Amino acid sequence: MSGSFRSNFSIASIHLRLYETIKSQSRIILLFCRGMFKRFAKYKSNLESAMVDVELEARIQIPKPTNIIFEDETVITYYRSTMYPSLIFRRINNGKLNSKETVEKIKYGEVTICLSIEQTYSNMDIKFPIIPANKRTISRKRICENPIVDITKCGDQYTLEIEFDYSNYMHIEKILKEWKNPYWPPVKPMEISSSNLAKKLANNEQWCISPKADGIHVLVYSDGENQFIVHTNGYTEGDTNIKVNRIFEGELMSNGEILYFDCLMWENKNITKLDYIARYKYLENMNKKEIILFNNIYAIKKYLDKKHDFETDGYIITNIKNRKKVYKSKFKNTVDLRYKNGYLLLENEEFSERSPKNVNEQLEEDKIYEFDMEMNLIRERKDKTIANYKMPYDDNPIYKIAHSIGVPTLRYYHNKIKRELLSMLPKTTLLDIGSAKGGDITKWTNLKFEKVYAVDPNLELRQRSKKVVEIRENIEDVYKMFDYESVSLFFVPWNDKFMDVINKAKYFVLICMDKPVTVKEDCFECKIENEKVILKIPDTQTSEYVEENLIKYTDVFKKLKNWKHMKINRTMNTGSAQEIELSRMYSYHFFSKK
């Protein structure tokens, strides 16, 4: 490392570290691969040309730095082109026009690495129309020249930006360690589907549940008497010139009160390695959220209907031992989207067809807004700098698990069995009959099948894979057109025409309802009448209404004379009594040719 870099950066660190007393207590470990910085730097070298500028940056959001004076203020006007939607055009302080196109962008934890190509134009160079999109005012403070390290301010957001290349990429990790705050930003509760949450809760770990206050997530830094607040976007409220020795996590309510739910540092000691119950004890005599411990989700059904003294919009489910396993269960799902060029984008999207509905106000370019699932505007998210990366799953998953709505625990159980059966097959060519929406694509991919023929006359795959061949036909009309080694038939009404399809293969796995009974429960109904089985499972995508012939599967198995048959004996022992009752109507089978 050059002497100029070392001296410049150490001086800047003395004046600009936000929480020096905090950082001195913590050993920061960043999960960044040095090889990734090297790869990007080499990529930049290969792209460099006299025709364009190639920019490579590592960026990380930081809380508001103290003792810093920004030297300049820049007004950037952004433009868009309908002819070249991947290009961003911008004009700085009414100067020349500049275009920027992202070549590669990757995010590791809180650090974004971005490689882009830039080009400057005169007004006469642009031969196509561009439309003004928005303006941003940015202030900048240069704190190092090699590599170039800037702190930028845009509104209440502060970003550390490091320009690097192949000559100095090895310094990036050290710089990021200097500026990475050990407690901020706080752990964000994750969206999760009811079946995936059921999977988490089935692992016999200890969890707690608490109401999700309809407030703003903040960290509270305190010296025991005075305090200041840091929002998740870095905005800071209060006097930061205190000797911080305690850090709490809480919700800032609309009435100005803070509802505490965690302690991260106590008397200058990082206590995040303690389990949640131990950390929660440090909130004694504070305005704290109630938490309820549980091992069995069905034991808290009554709690889910409890009224609270403050406004809530769901529940938070926290793992006692692992503070990063935090999930949210909202009564009604919403999504935070970035407004760009009239459309609503997830953070990892370049294009989208979503557009806001019933909007009576002018939305600002590149701002983040909260919408319901019908794309009706709820509010601007001034506390957010990053939009959601994916659309939410089903509403209120914890409630659905507790009340067996959509049988989420049974779905998890059956997915586990499907993976087990598929793992018993050779990973060559698989023919899947009745693929529907492609719920098993992830299993096929993870198990590394060479090729999968997904056959269903009503095929609507929710995701795509290069190794999956989509066939929207009846299987008996197409199976002779290609070769396959294995067949999977999961929850598909039996048809004797399948026999020829199966006999062409060497392996066959089957999940079937061979023990149906007439019963009506809250979460499902099964009825046998006129030699038909009618199954209704509300709030599911593929089983709202299923009708099939009443099949005597022992007779089917007798027809598979040249096959070795293995019945997979599994018993569901988690989930509600109703889900367990339904699970007993199914059986699981593996066949291989003799």
Curated annotation (Swiss-Prot):
* InterPro entries found in the cross-reference section: SAM-dependent_MTases_sf
UniProt entry keywords in alphabetical sequence? Plasmid
Domain of life, per the record?
Eukaryota
What function does this protein fulfil? The presence of the two linear plasmids, termed pGKL1 and pGKL2, in strains of Kluyveromyces lactis confers the killer phenotype to the host cell, by promoting the secretion of a toxin able to inhibit the growth of sensitive strains.
Under what name is this protein listed? Uncharacterized killer plasmid pGKl-2 protein 3
- The record lists the organism as Kluyveromyces lactis (strain ATCC 8585 / CBS 2359 / DSM 70799 / NBRC 1267 / NRRL Y-1140 / WM37)
Q: What is the lineage of its organism?
A: Eukaryota, Fungi, Dikarya, Ascomycota, Saccharomycotina
